[in-house]
Amino acid sequence: MHKNDAMLGDESIGNLIVKLSAPAIVGLLVQALYNLVDTIFVGRGLGEESMLAIAGISVAFPIQILMMAIALGVGIGGSSIISRALGKKDIIKAERTVANMVTLVVTVSIAFTALCMVFLDPMLKVFGASDIVLPFANEYTRYIVIGTTFFTFSAAMSNAIRAEGNTKFAMAIMLVSSITNIILDPLFIFEFGMGVKGAAIATVISQLVGCVMVAYYYASSMSRLDLIFAYMIPDTKILGETISIGMSEFIFNVVESALFLLFNQSLLIYGGDVSIAVFGITIKVFMLTLMPIIGIKQGIQPIFGYNYGANEYARVKKTISFSNYIVTAMCIISTVI
């Protein structure tokens, strides 16, 4: 029996939730912090144009949420299949799912990148870029979009790694990527004088580092699953199941992107570019309070999937009860803070 099988199937639910959620929470908090630091560096690096530059980054946020929709749609859909397959001891199905996740996320990301590059300026105007902010938004978003596949691949496959119960390595991917970004930001923005373009390039490089770490994970003996190229041939059954499970998360993020579009347009009309910049900063600060809750969600997913696949429904129900108590307590604490 693999050590993660014993952990997911036998260890107490309370200990499991803490053990699997804590690394996810740490990684997500650091990631949220680097997003905030990114904005701070841009604000300090562009002098009188800083608010326009921050507004440009804020306008790009709905597009980044769409990128997240792709990553989470594939990641959550595929990881659910993987954890249930591991619970049933069906290693081949788990490996086929990992390979098909790669195929799906890369294909969709390339299509998304091509679409955005063709219609970038019209999209940015729809998302709230004024004529003054548009050059900053374009300069930043162009590079972010070019790096779409790096981001979505790293984020989606981190979910697959988490599905094995290896939340520590998934955390390491987020930590190393975030720290890389924080180190590169001042270098590109201040030392090279590249402004918002430098911030975007630093972000893309950090996402590429995440991709390299995912590749290393599957190439080494760290994963219990092999990434087999022959399995990357699309399996319609696995792809269909991945899409059907991940669709709700995908739609949720698309709707969230649409809401930010409406917010930005309203702020542009009634408050101007500075209001959009302030709103963008506020959202990034607010995200720090949400990350622990999202971390709990990520931590309990492999517990759900594995025990559901193993027909241990009592443990599934217990996980739901424990996680509900923890999340409720976190929400109360966040509200008080």
Predicted segments with their positions:
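Short membrane-interface helical motifs at transmembrane helix boundaries
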Residues: A111-R142, I333-I337
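Signature of the first transmembrane helix
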Residues: N15-S79, M247-L268
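Interhelical loop/hinge segments that connect adjacent transmembrane helices in multipass membrane
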Residues: M1-S21, T203, A215-E256
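Small-residue-rich hydrophobic transmembrane alpha-helices
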Residues: I54-A114, F151-A170, V278-V336
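Membrane-interface helix-loop junctions in multi-pass transport and translocation proteins
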Residues: D10, S178-V212, I337
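Residue-level recognition of transmembrane alpha-helices
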Residues: S21, L28, S58-F61, V105, ...
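Helix-terminus/linker motif at the lipid-water interface of multi-pass membrane proteins
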Residues: L29, L33-I54, L124-D131, L187-M194, ...
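Alpha-helical transmembrane segments of multi-pass membrane proteins
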Residues: D131-S154, G240, I281-T289
